[in-house]
Swiss-Prot record:
Entry similarity comment: Belongs to the bacterial ribosomal protein bS18 family.
Gene label: rpsR
Gene3D superfamilies for this protein: Ribosomal protein S18 (4.10.640.10)
InterPro entries, per the entry: Ribosomal_bS18, Ribosomal_bS18_CS, Ribosomal_bS18_sf
Subunit architecture: Part of the 30S ribosomal subunit. Forms a tight heterodimer with protein bS6.
Protein's job: Binds as a heterodimer with protein bS6 to the central domain of the 16S rRNA, where it helps stabilize the platform of the 30S subunit.
NCBIfam families xrefs: S18
UniProt keyword Ribonucleoprotein present: yes
Lineage of origin: Bacteria, Pseudomonadati, Campylobacterota, Epsilonproteobacteria, Nautiliales
Protein name: Small ribosomal subunit protein bS18
Length: 91
């Protein structure tokens, strides 16, 4: 019989950095939870804990409402990394 594969347990990167609040204006922090089409990625792919996943989802939804992140992206014009064009706010 084939042996079961052992998967490495993912750790929440927000817990590692001891993030207590995820702000919707901090695009650099929430961009890791968005796909190339600006969809919210699930917990099983990002490795976020439930508390931080809820905070990320709320921040992304608020950023969409404030027009900082688009709701949808045209399928014909998908770019590999949408955040390459953004200049860092903080230096």
């Amino acid at each position: 019989m084939a042996e079961k594969r052992r998967f490495k347990k993912r750790t929440c990167k927000y817990c590692e950095q001891k993030v207590t609040f995820i702000d919707y204006k901090d695009i650099e922090l929430i961009k890791h939870s968005l796909s190339e089409r600006y969809k919210i990625m699930p917990r099983r792919l990002t490795g976020n804990c439930k508390k931080h996943q809820v905070m990320v989802e709320e921040a992304i939804k608020r950023a969409r409402h404030a027009a900082l992140v688009p709701y949808i992206v045209d399928r014909k014009r998908v770019i590999p990394n949408p955040f390459e064009e953004l200049q860092p706010i903080y230096k």
